[in-house]
């Protein structure tokens, strides 16, 4: 039996500031609700995509796991004052999730370098088996058109 925790980290707490959701968020339903609230509050927020990526990994692990395996998903939130304060919040929330779920391994789903700064915090408490960086794809044609239009209006 292997217990895997899928983690999404919001180090600067956009989830709390923009959507009014406090971390930790634990469980598939609560995580999906949080992602929707953040996506509605700010459709351009990249943390929404990272959270959806965590849900994707959670669901794929459930599909592939044995019936004796456990899989859970959680969002850890930091603080708008990124640094020691946000890292302490993430550590405290991770300790709570570990106490409740007792994972053997973790999968970290992130949207970039800022959230990846939490890797030492997470790896000091649970083994990270995989790190997935979610990067939103955009149409090159749209990007080029926007760039050229911005040059015209300088």
Predicted regions and their residues:
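Hydrophobic transmembrane alpha-helix segments characteristic of membrane transport
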Residues: 145-149
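Short, charged, surface-exposed secondary-structure boundary motifs
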Residues: 136-144
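Conserved small/polar residues in nucleotide/adenosyl-binding loops
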Residues: 152-154
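Soluble N-terminal domains of membrane-associated systems
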Residues: 1-128, 135
């Amino acid at each position: 039996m292997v217990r895997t925790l899928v983690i999404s980290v919001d180090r600067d707490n956009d989830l709390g500031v923009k959507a009014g959701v406090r971390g930790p968020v634990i469980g598939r339903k609560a995580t999906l609700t949080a992602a929707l609230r953040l996506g509605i509050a700010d459709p351009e927020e990249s943390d929404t995509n990272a959270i959806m990526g965590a849900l994707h990994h959670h669901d794929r692990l459930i599909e592939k796991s044995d019936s004796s395996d456990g899989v859970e998903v959680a969002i850890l939130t930091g603080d708008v004052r990124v640094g020691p304060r946000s890292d302490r919040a993430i550590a405290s929330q991770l300790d709570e999730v570990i106490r409740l779920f007792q994972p053997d391994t973790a999968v970290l789903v992130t949207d970039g370098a800022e959230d990846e700064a939490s890797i030492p915090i997470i790896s000091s408490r649970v083994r990270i088996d995989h790190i997935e960086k979610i990067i939103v794809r955009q149409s090159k044609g749209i990007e080029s058109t926007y760039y050229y239009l911005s040059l015209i209006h300088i």
